[in-house]
């Protein structure tokens, strides 16, 4: 070989690096242009409680593994604790920026997973770009509290990437990375318990032998079974909203209809429709074709498409964030099917690929338009939260004294009703906290955020009837337009009971030192 001759391996490596950098750049541009404006908005809803939990965990490390109201998602806490060190602990901009970065990183991981499953560099990049610009995936980018969804997907995609291909043996490094990915999945969200099935799909794709599945599936399955047993023991009645109904069989068809733009994705009122059945039939035909043609990666894509939905079948609602992982599996399946079509019908290869490029472009454009509409909805939601934050700042001194404070909700305003009835983007399902002002933010988390003292926590006293019986404190009443400090009272429990008897919602909070 002369000096002018290129090393083929170097060329392949260089092309791979260029492909990765180009994909990362396109994803970065897409996230910045589409989602970036959200960084300047106030936080919304559950985000304040999760940040409050992370605030306490930064001072009390035992809370790093604790649940938040029976939701055991410690990696959510960890990322928020890291945020507190990277950014100002009470600055929404930092938390939002990290969520946007995570959104982009998951899309890049999806491109890597696509390559691992056999997609070409262009197809893998297209899958990642369609995913990152989709309204089915934007809720976790727009709401800081919902990082657990992309964190779970990132862990599963990492597991796919490190799992050896057919003919490749396990190495110490691969084993370590696979264990880390599985532990990361377990730390992200309870849905991780379906991971043994993903492991089975990966190993079957690698070995094509049912007998070979037993060792890895048994190991991960035992870990998942232990997790389930401990979870049921710790939180025996935590998911009281599970129920049987038509939503159980309607959920998957409705998801698929939305993915194919044959119908709307509705977060509630799930019913079986003709569009859903048609979409189910289309996806089944694609999957059967890929399996008959022995397309590598098909079982893995199907696992991502179906598995995340199984633990939530009994949940009678389906918010946007539930769609992010299944949509990744759907896009991978479509990519594998198109690739198989192109290679099987080589006479029509250019036409098939051209059609795929045009379709992907149209889907990205349509998705981006809906994401921008979603952004406007979140802008309205953030503005409503900012009003409450400004009102709370007017009476924060009344809460800062260290005494129990009775917070009375003496209004029935619903500032998000417009978003619920007529959203500009996809239908949304924000959680309403009826006991808290405007139903927006948990009272303790609200005043802890407004107080913004690193060493101070605002506790919520739920058992105030016994804890505050005969205790001196103060009363703050929230009415339309703001809070009113009614001053000191001699018995917080008695005053709270009086307001409750008048059909008012009450909370009792108290500032306590963290250190």
Question: Where are the predicted features?
Answer:
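Polytopic membrane enzymes that build or remodel cell-surface glycoconjugates and lipids
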Residues: 2-515
């Amino acid at each position: 070989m002369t000096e002018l001759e290129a090393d083929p391996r170097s060329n392949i490596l260089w092309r791979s690096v260029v492909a990765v950098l180009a994909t990362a750049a396109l994803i970065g541009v897409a996230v910045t242009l589409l989602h970036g404006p959200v960084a300047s908005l106030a936080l919304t809803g559950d985000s304040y409680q999760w940040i409050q939990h992370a605030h306490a965990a930064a001072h009390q490390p035992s809370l790093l593994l604790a649940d938040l109201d029976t939701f055991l998602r410690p990696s959510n806490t960890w990322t928020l604790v890291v945020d507190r060190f990277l950014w100002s602990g009470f600055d929404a901009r930092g938390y939002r920026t990290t969520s946007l970065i995570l959104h982009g990183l998951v899309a890049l991981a999806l491109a890597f997973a696509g390559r691992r499953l056999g997609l070409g560099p262009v197809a893998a990049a297209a899958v990642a770009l369609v995913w990152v610009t989709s309204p089915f995936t934007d809720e976790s980018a727009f709401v800081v509290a919902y990082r657990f969804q992309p964190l779970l997907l990132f862990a599963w995609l990492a597991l796919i990437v490190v799992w050896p291909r057919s003919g490749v043996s396990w190495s110490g490094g691969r084993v370590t990375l696979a264990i880390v990915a599985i532990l990361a999945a377990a730390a992200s969200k309870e849905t991780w318990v379906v991971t043994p099935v993903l492991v089975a799909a990966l190993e079957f794709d690698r070995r094509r032998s049912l007998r070979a599945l037993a060792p890895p599936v048994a190991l991960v399955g035992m870990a998942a079974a232990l997790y389930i047993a401990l979870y049921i023991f710790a939180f025996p009645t935590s998911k009281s909203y599970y129920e049987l109904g038509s939503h159980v069989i309607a959920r998957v068809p409705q998801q698929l209809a939305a993915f194919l733009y044959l119908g709307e994705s509705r977060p509630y009122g799930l019913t079986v429709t003709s569009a859903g059945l048609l979409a189910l039939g289309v996806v089944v035909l694609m999957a059967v074709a890929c399996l008959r043609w022995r397309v590598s990666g098909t079982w893995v894509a199907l696992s991502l498409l179906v598995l995340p939905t199984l633990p939530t079948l009994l949940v009678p609602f389906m918010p946007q964030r539930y769609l992010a992982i299944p949509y990744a599996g759907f896009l991978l399946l479509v990519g594998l099917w198109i690739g198989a079509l192109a290679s099987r019908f080589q006479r029509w290869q250019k036409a098939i690929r051209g059609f795929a490029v045009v379709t992907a472009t149209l889907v990205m454009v349509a998705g981006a338009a809906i994401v921008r509409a979603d952004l406007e909805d979140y802008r309205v939601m953030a503005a409503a939260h900012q009003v409450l934050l400004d009102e709370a700042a007017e009476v924060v001194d009344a809460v800062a004294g260290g005494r129990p404070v009775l917070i009375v909700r003496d209004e029935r305003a619903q500032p998000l009703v417009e978003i619920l009835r007529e959203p500009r983007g996809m239908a949304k399902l924000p959680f309403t906290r009826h006991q808290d002002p405007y139903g927006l933010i948990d009272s303790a988390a609200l005043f802890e955020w407004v107080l913004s003292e690193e060493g101070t926590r605002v506790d919520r006293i739920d058992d105030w009837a016994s804890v505050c019986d005969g205790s001196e404190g103060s009363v703050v009443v929230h009415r339309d337009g703001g809070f009113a400090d009614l001053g000191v009272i001699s018995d917080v429990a008695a005053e709270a009971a009086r307001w409750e008897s008048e059909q008012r919602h009450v909370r009792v909070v108290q500032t306590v030192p963290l250190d």
